[in-house]
A protein has these predicted regions:
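Well-ordered beta-strand positions in beta-sheet-rich domains
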Residues: 16-20, 110-112, 272-274
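Conserved P-loop NTP-binding catalytic core
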Residues: 37-48, 52, 61-111, 116-117
């Protein structure tokens, strides 16, 4: 469960920016049913991010997508010539900084990473405020079982990946949280069940439009459209010494349901965008 994330020099976030799931002092309604308590922590079970277009809402999600990519990239990284994935503000070459706190298995994890394309500058993992590993330049602290392996650590190698590969429990738990527990839905598609319900339930559609208008998206209507497209039932690849042939079996009709939003422009004109274009 996410507690907070701090980011610096990532996409539209140049200065240190914090997104926290901890409850604020002004929370009054549903303070019991909509919060999760763990020791002194009071966390919101859900949160919405509001704002105009191009104000960085999606970039909050992309923090976690980048982390997944960074960790998966470590599997393929073989030498110090490989570059770490970055997405800095305006493409600058300054370090990117992340500090993420989360709750897993009744433990509070704090993971911090500062890095550039070529190397990791700082990195640490704390569990219930106990240091599991840390790095500050060339100074590296590891669990006793990994100390003999310290000379093998590359400058572009994440200690989180290194430690979980070598069966450090807390590192494995943190790695699992980033790679498995954090689920990022496909924002270009909605589940057919949701679209069907929106098409049939006029009251649900009305409430959704009001919600979108409250978020200041200038959406005045939504429409569910069905379309049919012919797709091959089977594709075969036939190859011999000289030629490779792509064979398509029978075409079948595949039905798709899509969401379209009608926007009102600055001059009171309207235009329609599909959900994938939003």
């Amino acid at each position: 469960m996410l507690i907070s994330v701090e980011v610096e020099n990532f996409r539209s976030f140049y200065d240190r920016t914090v997104f926290s799931m901890e409850t604020g002092s002004k929370l009054r309604s549903y303070s019991t049913t909509n919060t999760h308590r763990f020791k002194r922590l009071k966390l919101l079970k859900s949160a919405f991010v509001f704002g105009g277009n191009a104000n960085g809402k999606t970039n909050v999600i992309k923090i976690f997508r980048l982390f997944k990519e960074l960790l998966i990239q470590q599997i393929k990284t073989k030498s110090e010539l490989d570059r770490l994935v970055t997405d800095t503000f305006g493409g600058n070459s300054e370090p990117t900084v992340f500090l993420i706190k989360f709750l897993k298995n009744n433990k509070v994890f704090t993971y911090e990473l500062e890095y550039v394309e070529e190397r990791v500058i700082k990195e640490s993992l704390l569990v219930n405020e106990r240091v599991i590993f840390s790095r500050n330049g060339d100074e590296i602290f590891l669990p006793d079982s990994l100390t003999p392996l310290r000379p093998t650590i590359r400058k572009n190698q994440l200690l989180l990946f290194f430690a979980q590969t070598n069966n450090i429990l807390e590192a494995k738990e943190a790695y699992e949280w980033f790679v498995i527990d954090v689920v990022i839905p496909n924002t270009n598609k909605l589940h057919p069940t949701i679209l069907k319900e929106l098409k049939q339930n006029k009251e649900l559609k009305r409430k959704l439009i009001l919600f979108l208008q409250a978020a200041d998206f200038n959406i005045v209507d939504i429409e569910i459209r069905d379309r049919t497209e012919q797709l091959p039932s089977e594709i075969l690849l036939k190859s011999n010494d000289k030629n490779t042939e792509l064979m398509i079996r029978d075409l079948i009709d595949q039905r798709f349901t899509e969401l379209y939003c009608t926007h009102r422009g600055a001059n009171e004109d309207t235009f329609v965008l599909s959900f994938s274009e939003e």
